[in-house]
Each structure stands twice: as C-alpha cells, then as structure tokens.
C-alpha cells in the first residue's frame, strides 16, 4: 500500500480567531483563494463537503470529503476516499498553532491506498505543493491585511 505526506506551513501575524474565521468562510474563497476555488457544506464532524480545486494549467478537481475534526481556532480535518476505502484515501489537516504574537498555519495531507503511487506518478505531488503554497500565501495576505480592508 502506498503512502505519501505533503506538508506546508506559514507564519501569520494575526490571532488564531482571525485565521480560523477566514479559512472557514467558504463563501469568500473565490475572492482570495487561488487553490480551493469553491467549498460547500457544514463544518461539523460527519458532514460531507464539496471541494473544488484549481490545479496547474486550469485543471479542476472536485471531491467530497467527510469532516472528521472541527476544533475552532485550532484544527480542521477531513477525509476523502476515491471509491472504496483503501484505494486512495486523503486525510487533510489544517492546523493553527500559537507562534509568538501570531500563529503557525500548517496544511498537511496524508495520502494512502494502493492507487497512491499511480496518483503521484502523474505529477500530483508537485501540483499539490504549489496549490498549498498559494493557499497559505493568500490566506496570510488576506488575514494580515484584514484591518486595511475594513
């Protein structure tokens, strides 16, 4: 069975509450989020979301993960499966950790299942890293300039 871990992080000079508010305000994603273009659903454990990503060259990917953890201002996690469990499972986590007067925002994704090596052979890993970095940068900019927009 294959296993891959993708992890990116950034420091955001803002309180956890502000970071959480922006990263869970799905309706505003089209305004600022270059990677997750659309997200729908309720952030409650057991609820299913609909997530639409924009990858390289305008490619789009839609998936429907199930929310597994919601700890406001600390952690959001969901699990997506392709077909049956064990084929290609994706456990994505968004963590907000105290760091000085701001936070460290960590986004990680653990991919498991027998299809994982095939998915990563088609350049998925590089596209996800670029997307995660774009998400992190855009979130940091959005949150740190919130006072300027208000």
Where are these regions (language model features)?
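Hydrophobic ligand-binding cavity/cleft-lining segments
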Residues: 1-44, 134
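Non-catalytic interaction surface on structured domains
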Residues: 4, 29, 65, 91-94, ...
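Hydrophobic/aromatic beta-strand elements that line small-molecule binding cavities or substrate pockets
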Residues: 8-10, 63-69, 90-98
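Short, flexible helix/strand-to-coil boundary loops that buttress conserved ligand/catalytic motifs
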Residues: 33, 80, 119
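Glycine-rich portal/gate segments that line the openings of hydrophobic small-molecule binding cavities
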Residues: 40-85, 99, 104, 137-150
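A short, polar/proline- and glycine-enriched secondary-structure boundary/capping micro-motif
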Residues: 60-62, 87-91, 115-121
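Short, solvent-exposed aromatic-acidic interface loops
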Residues: 81-86, 108-115
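A conserved amphipathic terminal alpha-helix motif
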Residues: 104, 111-150
